[in-house]
Protein backbone atom coordinates (compact mmCIF):
# COMPACT_ATOMS: atom_id res chain seq x y z
CA UNK A 1 0.00 0.00 0.00
CA UNK A 2 1.08 3.58 -0.67
CA UNK A 3 0.02 6.67 1.23
CA UNK A 4 -0.34 9.94 -0.67
CA UNK A 5 -1.22 12.83 1.67
CA UNK A 6 -4.55 14.48 0.88
CA UNK A 7 -5.40 11.70 -1.53
CA UNK A 8 -6.69 8.11 -1.53
CA UNK A 9 -4.79 4.96 -0.57
CA UNK A 10 -3.04 3.20 -3.45
CA UNK A 11 -2.30 -0.49 -3.91
CA UNK A 12 0.35 -2.12 -6.08
CA UNK A 13 -0.91 -4.30 -8.91
CA UNK A 14 2.07 -6.11 -10.39
CA UNK A 15 0.27 -7.48 -13.45
CA UNK A 16 -1.35 -4.25 -14.65
CA UNK A 17 0.07 -1.65 -17.02
CA UNK A 18 -0.76 1.03 -14.44
CA UNK A 19 0.52 -0.58 -11.27
CA UNK A 20 -0.52 2.01 -8.72
CA UNK A 21 -4.29 1.69 -8.36
CA UNK A 22 -6.39 3.83 -6.02
CA UNK A 23 -8.56 1.93 -3.54
CA UNK A 24 -12.11 3.12 -4.13
CA UNK A 25 -15.60 2.00 -3.20
CA UNK A 26 -16.70 0.14 -0.05
CA UNK A 27 -16.38 3.36 1.94
CA UNK A 28 -12.63 3.70 1.26
CA UNK A 29 -11.10 7.04 2.36
CA UNK A 30 -10.87 9.63 -0.40
CA UNK A 31 -8.40 11.80 1.51
CA UNK A 32 -6.03 11.24 4.44
CA UNK A 33 -2.82 12.51 6.01
CA UNK A 34 -1.20 9.36 7.39
CA UNK A 35 -1.46 5.60 7.00
CA UNK A 36 -0.40 2.77 9.31
CA UNK A 37 -0.65 -0.99 8.85
CA UNK A 38 -0.75 -2.85 12.15
CA UNK A 39 1.28 -6.03 11.80
CA UNK A 40 -0.03 -7.33 15.12
CA UNK A 41 -3.78 -6.77 14.72
CA UNK A 42 -3.98 -6.86 10.90
CA UNK A 43 -5.85 -3.59 10.44
CA UNK A 44 -5.14 -0.70 8.08
CA UNK A 45 -5.53 2.75 9.67
CA UNK A 46 -5.75 6.24 8.25
CA UNK A 47 -5.29 9.36 10.37
CA UNK A 48 -6.68 12.75 9.47
CA UNK A 49 -9.26 11.62 6.94
CA UNK A 50 -12.82 11.97 5.71
CA UNK A 51 -15.78 10.53 7.59
CA UNK A 52 -17.72 7.70 5.99
CA UNK A 53 -20.11 9.20 3.45
CA UNK A 54 -18.28 12.55 3.38
CA UNK A 55 -15.33 13.96 1.43
CA UNK A 56 -14.02 16.70 3.76
CA UNK A 57 -10.82 15.97 5.65
CA UNK A 58 -11.13 15.96 9.45
CA UNK A 59 -7.59 16.32 10.90
CA UNK A 60 -8.58 14.55 14.15
CA UNK A 61 -10.47 11.57 12.69
CA UNK A 62 -9.12 8.01 12.72
CA UNK A 63 -10.60 5.26 10.54
CA UNK A 64 -9.71 1.59 10.14
CA UNK A 65 -10.60 -1.05 7.59
CA UNK A 66 -12.23 -4.35 8.40
CA UNK A 67 -9.66 -6.77 9.81
CA UNK A 68 -7.50 -8.69 7.30
CA UNK A 69 -8.55 -6.49 4.37
CA UNK A 70 -7.59 -3.10 3.00
CA UNK A 71 -10.59 -2.67 0.68
CA UNK A 72 -13.58 -2.81 3.05
CA UNK A 73 -14.06 0.45 4.97
CA UNK A 74 -17.85 0.54 5.31
CA UNK A 75 -18.73 0.14 9.03
CA UNK A 76 -21.27 -2.68 9.36
CA UNK A 77 -22.43 -5.04 12.07
CA UNK A 78 -20.95 -7.87 9.98
CA UNK A 79 -17.40 -6.48 9.79
CA UNK A 80 -14.84 -4.71 12.00
CA UNK A 81 -14.41 -1.43 10.09
CA UNK A 82 -14.91 1.69 12.16
CA UNK A 83 -13.75 5.14 13.19
CA UNK A 84 -13.25 7.47 16.13
CA UNK A 85 -12.45 11.12 16.57
CA UNK A 86 -9.89 12.41 19.06
CA UNK A 87 -11.14 15.27 21.21
CA UNK A 88 -7.96 17.02 22.40
CA UNK A 89 -5.79 18.92 19.95
CA UNK A 90 -6.35 20.33 16.49
CA UNK A 91 -4.56 17.85 14.20
CA UNK A 92 -2.91 14.43 14.28
CA UNK A 93 0.82 14.89 13.68
CA UNK A 94 2.49 11.49 14.19
CA UNK A 95 1.68 7.82 14.78
CA UNK A 96 3.82 4.88 15.90
CA UNK A 97 3.12 1.19 16.45
CA UNK A 98 4.47 -0.11 19.77
CA UNK A 99 4.29 -3.60 21.22
CA UNK A 100 0.78 -3.44 22.62
CA UNK A 101 -0.72 -0.20 21.34
CA UNK A 102 -0.68 2.39 18.61
CA UNK A 103 0.53 5.78 19.80
CA UNK A 104 -1.07 8.85 18.24
CA UNK A 105 0.33 12.36 18.69
CA UNK A 106 -1.73 15.47 18.09
CA UNK A 107 -0.22 18.94 18.28
CA UNK A 108 -0.86 19.04 22.06
CA UNK A 109 -1.59 15.49 23.28
CA UNK A 110 -0.62 11.83 23.12
CA UNK A 111 -3.21 9.06 22.81
CA UNK A 112 -2.95 5.29 23.18
CA UNK A 113 -5.04 3.41 20.63
CA UNK A 114 -5.91 -0.15 21.68
CA UNK A 115 -8.09 -2.91 20.28
CA UNK A 116 -11.19 -3.45 22.42
CA UNK A 117 -12.86 -6.08 20.27
CA UNK A 118 -16.54 -6.56 19.62
CA UNK A 119 -18.63 -3.74 18.19
CA UNK A 120 -16.42 -1.09 19.84
CA UNK A 121 -13.43 -2.01 17.70
CA UNK A 122 -10.70 0.37 18.83
CA UNK A 123 -10.61 2.85 21.70
CA UNK A 124 -8.38 5.84 22.44
CA UNK A 125 -7.03 6.75 25.88
CA UNK A 126 -5.42 10.11 26.62
CA UNK A 127 -1.93 9.42 28.03
CA UNK A 128 -0.21 12.79 27.63
CA UNK A 129 -1.34 16.43 27.75
CA UNK A 130 0.31 19.80 27.19
CA UNK A 131 3.03 18.30 25.04
CA UNK A 132 4.32 18.95 21.54
CA UNK A 133 5.82 16.89 18.74
CA UNK A 134 8.18 18.43 16.21
CA UNK A 135 7.16 16.52 13.09
CA UNK A 136 5.62 13.40 11.63
CA UNK A 137 9.03 11.70 11.71
CA UNK A 138 10.35 12.97 15.05
CA UNK A 139 9.35 9.80 16.98
CA UNK A 140 11.45 6.66 17.48
CA UNK A 141 10.64 3.47 19.39
CA UNK A 142 13.28 1.44 21.21
CA UNK A 143 13.73 -0.66 24.33
CA UNK A 144 9.98 -0.67 25.03
CA UNK A 145 9.73 3.12 24.96
CA UNK A 146 8.79 5.89 22.55
CA UNK A 147 11.14 8.87 22.35
CA UNK A 148 10.38 12.09 20.52
CA UNK A 149 11.50 15.64 20.00
CA UNK A 150 8.98 18.32 20.86
CA UNK A 151 9.12 21.98 19.96
CA UNK A 152 11.16 22.98 23.01
CA UNK A 153 12.05 19.76 24.83
CA UNK A 154 12.33 15.97 24.50
CA UNK A 155 9.85 13.38 25.77
CA UNK A 156 9.53 9.66 26.44
CA UNK A 157 6.59 7.32 26.90
CA UNK A 158 6.80 4.01 28.77
CA UNK A 159 3.17 3.72 29.82
CA UNK A 160 3.21 7.30 31.03
CA UNK A 161 4.43 10.46 29.35
CA UNK A 162 7.50 12.16 30.80
CA UNK A 163 9.81 15.02 29.92
CA UNK A 164 13.20 13.57 29.01
CA UNK A 165 15.95 15.43 30.92
CA UNK A 166 18.50 16.77 28.43
CA UNK A 167 21.64 18.73 29.27
CA UNK A 168 21.85 19.79 25.60
CA UNK A 169 18.38 21.32 25.54
CA UNK A 170 19.60 24.93 25.35
CA UNK A 171 22.18 24.00 22.71
CA UNK A 172 19.57 22.35 20.47
CA UNK A 173 16.56 24.63 20.84
CA UNK A 174 18.53 27.84 21.31
CA UNK A 175 19.84 27.51 17.74
CA UNK A 176 16.88 25.80 16.08
CA UNK A 177 15.36 26.92 12.78
CA UNK A 178 11.76 27.02 13.95
CA UNK A 179 10.51 27.35 10.36
CA UNK A 180 11.83 23.84 9.64
CA UNK A 181 10.29 21.66 12.36
CA UNK A 182 8.79 19.44 9.66
CA UNK A 183 12.31 18.31 8.69
CA UNK A 184 13.07 16.73 12.07
CA UNK A 185 13.75 13.03 11.58
CA UNK A 186 14.34 10.44 14.32
CA UNK A 187 16.06 7.08 14.03
CA UNK A 188 16.98 4.16 16.27
CA UNK A 189 20.58 2.88 16.30
CA UNK A 190 19.77 -0.28 18.22
CA UNK A 191 23.31 -1.65 18.20
CA UNK A 192 24.56 1.28 20.29
CA UNK A 193 21.34 1.93 22.27
CA UNK A 194 20.93 5.33 20.65
CA UNK A 195 18.13 7.56 19.39
CA UNK A 196 19.22 10.09 16.76
CA UNK A 197 17.42 13.29 15.78
CA UNK A 198 18.40 15.25 12.68
CA UNK A 199 17.32 18.88 12.47
CA UNK A 200 17.95 22.26 10.82
CA UNK A 201 19.77 24.89 12.85
CA UNK A 202 19.61 28.65 12.43
CA UNK A 203 23.20 28.69 11.15
CA UNK A 204 22.53 26.25 8.30
CA UNK A 205 24.67 27.19 5.27
CA UNK A 206 21.78 26.72 2.87
CA UNK A 207 19.55 29.71 3.59
CA UNK A 208 17.18 29.54 0.61
CA UNK A 209 16.49 25.81 0.91
CA UNK A 210 17.51 24.69 4.42
CA UNK A 211 18.30 21.02 5.02
CA UNK A 212 19.12 19.11 8.20
CA UNK A 213 22.65 20.04 9.20
CA UNK A 214 22.88 18.93 12.85
CA UNK A 215 22.04 15.93 14.98
CA UNK A 216 21.56 15.19 18.66
CA UNK A 217 21.80 11.69 20.14
CA UNK A 218 20.35 10.16 23.29
CA UNK A 219 21.90 6.97 24.65
CA UNK A 220 19.05 5.43 26.62
CA UNK A 221 21.22 2.77 28.25
CA UNK A 222 23.83 5.15 29.67
CA UNK A 223 21.42 8.11 29.90
CA UNK A 224 23.81 10.50 28.16
CA UNK A 225 23.53 12.96 25.26
CA UNK A 226 25.92 13.97 22.48
CA UNK A 227 25.70 16.04 19.32
CA UNK A 228 27.36 16.79 16.02
CA UNK A 229 27.28 18.51 12.63
CA UNK A 230 26.37 16.96 9.31
CA UNK A 231 28.64 17.82 6.40
CA UNK A 232 26.66 18.71 3.28
Feature locations, PLM:
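Solenoidal tandem-repeat scaffolds enriched in leucines and small polar residues
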Residues: 27-66
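A short beta-strand motif characteristic of beta-propeller blades
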Residues: 18-26, 79-85, 123-129
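Per-blade loop-tip surfaces of WD-repeat and WD-like beta-propellers in eukaryotic adaptors/scaffolds
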Residues: 65-78, 111-123
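Asp-box/WD-like beta-propeller blade repeats and closely related beta-sheet repeat scaffolds
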Residues: 7-8, 13-37
Amino acid sequence: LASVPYGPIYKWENDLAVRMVAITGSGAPVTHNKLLISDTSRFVFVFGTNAYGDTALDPMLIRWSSQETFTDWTPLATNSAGSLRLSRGSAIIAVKQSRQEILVWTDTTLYSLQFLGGSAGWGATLVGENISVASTNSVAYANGAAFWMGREKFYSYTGQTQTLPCDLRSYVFGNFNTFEYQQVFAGNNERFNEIWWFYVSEDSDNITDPIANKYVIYNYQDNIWYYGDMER
